[in-house]
């Protein structure tokens, strides 16, 4: 029956299916062995049976009855992968490998199960599948998909041709030919390949689903949604098309229809994990607070919205003014921004599934999702830098109609982070220097592939850095206007490499000139420092270290280790000298364990507070995400009553973690010290969300400040809250007597909308 399906002989396939169904219904006891249970399970799925019941009553039972048959493991894995239940698929396939280690299908499925979590093992499994069968069509098709993701369209076509040489009727291969034509702006080719792929009616809806899915994976959500709608016209109950359309719509900001579709799929198929996750998330989003300003709709946890929601709106407004103007973009409004205190919720909203631990934020064009500092532990990233980065994606994606390669989109966003604040974004480091000089640079013409299956997390971060370096190179050598013209070319469908050639002469020349540029930048990093990896002295004593240091006076690792050894001995003066030398040679170094970090400890132990202050100021000017030196500097500034510096630095701490009480307390102290009563409103409002020891005092102070700021209604509310907590609070009683019943509303306050995520 499956063979007839693949050969596009649906009538003969249906005859067999009906015959199988008749036999099972007549004598079910004859088909209760493990192998036949799997066949019956597949039959029920084809007839629209409940996937969860098929899994439990057919596949699981077959596996229990005979763990040594591979049929149940493969069937379970295929169903789990369709539902994106990668954990179940992986556990099932690991058993299958033990039973049948020479089956290419097992390794192909294993590669798909491993893909989201272990790219290296996934690639190895794919290679094993082709080693066992060079003509394994599913594997060849999957390779074509990956090459499309890397924008290696010629190579992808070669894989598809190999598939079609074996099976000229392979609908999915023809569908991917249509995808490539679409991405290359070949509309006639797209239509031709689509027509061929759709000539077999039983897979007609699948063809549109496959094309739409791949386009959405390339961030072409509008085109992807159009294809899913076509699929649903042909098959209104096509579950995969419905849930994909739901996600497309949610990523386009069309939330009402998107949530309705997710709910419908969840009711239709309770084993659809993405639908279940989305419906569950929608219920949690109902408890979020919604803020609006300047074309932005921001959803946040209610408590967090009170603490720093105003800062989010202000940051987004600044980013809009700067970046939309710079790139000549009139935004399509509204821009949705959703900030999640739970990383799992962020992942589900973004990807449909838990995971994505390395992502701080994601932009789809008009929708931004981001992790709040609450989801990131003790050392969160600078959320202002994250939102600036993601909003830059809004600008460039909208300018290009989502038709830009990932490397250019990420490169511009990182570049603009650096332009906005020297401590944001990425800069050349010792690790990046080693990659560049060690021939780890990816040619510009192949950069999109650097983001797929990088060999390590460092290499993924380097892909972002290299992309920003390409943008910097283009702006320095060809100008910002040329970069904007490239974006304009992309918006009308011109391939990136063709556009680059228009302005740089040739891709080969661009690749070579950029490599020279990057290598020159790497070599210019700390030119007086020796970065070679030398063996440190075997004997850990003062004499051995001094002798080793004299023989290798300016070695990067050596100076660091030499200083660290003296610090272990608590010989602070001896540790200071090599650290000063490191800072002299390599002031750009902000990697973990850098000279700033070590020397700050030394200076504090020595009690040289003025020198420590200067060092910490130099450090935070280069690193926009490091929290401990900022906290220490706040202590120093407060001790010295440098209130202007306290105010400025506390704002910097809030850009990293606004959920800490101490920067709000410092802002409050600075405002009190300078007699700026109105400026106490923001820190007092935030601190009241952090379970203060004396809430009555804070409510009273806030009421007093609000009255001074011309907000008597809010002042009355808070003075009443003060009296709720402390009924005999004399100052609060006196303030209540002063308040009139009439109060003007604050025109600057964010407009709060309904909590429903559908609005």
Where are these regions (language model features)?
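Alpha-solenoid helical repeat scaffolds
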Residues: 1-2, 32-39, 71-75, 105-109, ...
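Long, contiguous interaction/recruitment modules in multidomain scaffold/adaptor proteins
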Residues: 6-35, 42-43, 47-48, 54, ...
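Structural signature of tandem alpha-helical TPR/SEL1-like repeats
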Residues: 8-22, 46-58, 82-95, 115-128, ...
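Juxtacatalytic substrate-recognition/specificity segment
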Residues: 16-23, 57, 91, 124-125, ...
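TPR/TPR-like (Sel1-like) alpha-helical repeat modules
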Residues: 18-21, 247-273, 280, 655-658, ...
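Structural marker of alpha-solenoid helical repeat scaffolds
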Residues: 23-30, 64-65, 99, 132, ...
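Beta/coil-rich, acidic/histidine-enriched accessory regions frequently appended to metallopeptidases
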Residues: 42, 92, 109, 135, ...
């Amino acid at each position: 029956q499956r063979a007839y399906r693949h050969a596009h002989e649906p009538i003969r396939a249906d005859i067999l299916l009906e015959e199988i169904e008749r036999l099972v219904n007549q004598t079910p006891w004859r088909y209760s062995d493990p192998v036949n249970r799997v066949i019956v399970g597949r039959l029920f799925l084809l007839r629209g049976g409940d996937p969860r019941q098929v899994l439990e009553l057919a596949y699981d039972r077959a596996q229990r009855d005979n763990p040594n048959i591979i049929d149940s493991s493969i069937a379970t894995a295929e169903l789990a992968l369709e539902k994106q239940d990668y954990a179940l698929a992986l556990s099932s396939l690991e058993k299958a490998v033990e039973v049948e280690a020479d089956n290419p299908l097992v390794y192909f499925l294993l590669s798909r199960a491993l893909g989201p979590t272990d790219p290296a093992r996934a690639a190895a499994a794919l290679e094993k599948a082709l080693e066992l069968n060079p003509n394994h069509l599913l594997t060849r098709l999957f390779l074509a998909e990956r090459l499309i993701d890397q924008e290696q369209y010629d190579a992808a076509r070669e894989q598809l041709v190999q598939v079609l040489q074996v099976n000229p009727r392979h609908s999915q291969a023809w569908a991917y030919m249509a995808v490539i034509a679409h991405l290359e702006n070949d509309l006639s080719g797209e239509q031709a390949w689509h027509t061929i792929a759709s000539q077999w009616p039983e897979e007609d809806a699948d063809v549109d689903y496959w094309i739409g899915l791949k386009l959405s994976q390339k961030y072409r959500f509008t085109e992807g949604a159009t294809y899913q709608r076509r699929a649903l016209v042909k098959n209104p109950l096509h579950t995969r098309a419905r849930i994909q359309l739901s996600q497309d719509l949610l990523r386009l900001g069309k939330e009402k229809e998107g949530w309705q579709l997710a709910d419908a799929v969840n009711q239709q198929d309770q084993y659809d994990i993405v639908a279940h996750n989305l419906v569950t998330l929608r219920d949690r989003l109902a408890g979020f607070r919604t803020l609006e300003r300047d074309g932005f709709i921001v959803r946040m946890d209610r408590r967090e919205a009170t603490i720093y929601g105003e800062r989010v709106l202000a940051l987004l407004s600044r980013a809009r003014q700067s970046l939309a103007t710079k790139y000549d973009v009139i935004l399509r409004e509204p821009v949705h921004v959703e900030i999640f205190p739970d990383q799992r919720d962020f992942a589900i909203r973004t990807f449909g599934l838990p995971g994505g631990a390395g992502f701080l934020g994601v932009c789809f064009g008009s929708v931004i999702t981001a992790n709040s500092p609450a989801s990131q532990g003790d050392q969160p990233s600078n959320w202002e830098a994250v939102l600036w980065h993601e909003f830059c994606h809004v600008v460039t994606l909208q300018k290009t109609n989502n038709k830009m390669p990932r490397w250019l989109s990420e490169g511009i966003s990182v570049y603009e982070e650096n332009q906005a604040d020297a401590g944001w974004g990425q800069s050349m480091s010792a690790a990046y220097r080693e990659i560049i000089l060690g021939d780890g640079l990816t040619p510009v013409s192949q950069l999109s592939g650097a983001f797929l299956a990088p060999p390590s997390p460092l290499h993924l971060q380097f892909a972002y850095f290299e992309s920003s370096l390409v943008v910097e190179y283009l702006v320095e050598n060809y100008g910002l206007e040329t970069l904007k013209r490239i974006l304009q070319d992309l918006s009308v469908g011109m391939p990136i490499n063709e556009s680059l050639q228009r302005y740089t002469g040739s891709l080969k020349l661009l690749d070579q000139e950029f490599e020279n540029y990057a290598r020159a930048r790497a070599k210019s990093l700390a030119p007086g420092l020796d970065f070679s990896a030398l063996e440190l002295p075997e004997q850990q004593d003062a004499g051995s270290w001094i002798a080793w240091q004299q023989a290798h006076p300016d070695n990067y690792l050596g100076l660091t280790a030499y200083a660290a050894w003296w610090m272990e001995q608590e010989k602070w003066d001896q540790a200071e000298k090599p650290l000063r030398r490191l800072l002299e040679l390599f002031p750009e170094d902000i990697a973990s364990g850098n000279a700033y970090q070590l020397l700050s400890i030394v200076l504090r132990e020595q009690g040289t507070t003025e020198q420590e202050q200067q060092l910490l100021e130099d450090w935070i000017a280069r690193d926009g995400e490091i929290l401990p030196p900022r906290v220490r500097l706040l202590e120093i500034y407060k001790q010295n009553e440098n209130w202007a510096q306290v105010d400025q630095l506390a704002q910097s701490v809030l850009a990293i973690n606004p959920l800490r009480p101490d920067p709000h307390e410092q802002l409050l102290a600075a405002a009190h010290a300078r007699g700026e009563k109105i400026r106490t409103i923001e820190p007092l409002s935030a601190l009241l969300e952090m379970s203060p020891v004396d809430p009555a005092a804070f409510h009273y102070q806030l009421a007093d400040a609000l009255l001074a700021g011309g907000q008597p209604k809010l002042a009355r509310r808070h003075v009443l809250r003060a009296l709720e907590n402390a009924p005999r609070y004399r100052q609060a009683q006196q303030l209540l007597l002063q308040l009139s019943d009439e109060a003007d509303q604050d025109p600057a306050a964010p407009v709060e909308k309904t909590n429903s995520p559908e609005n």
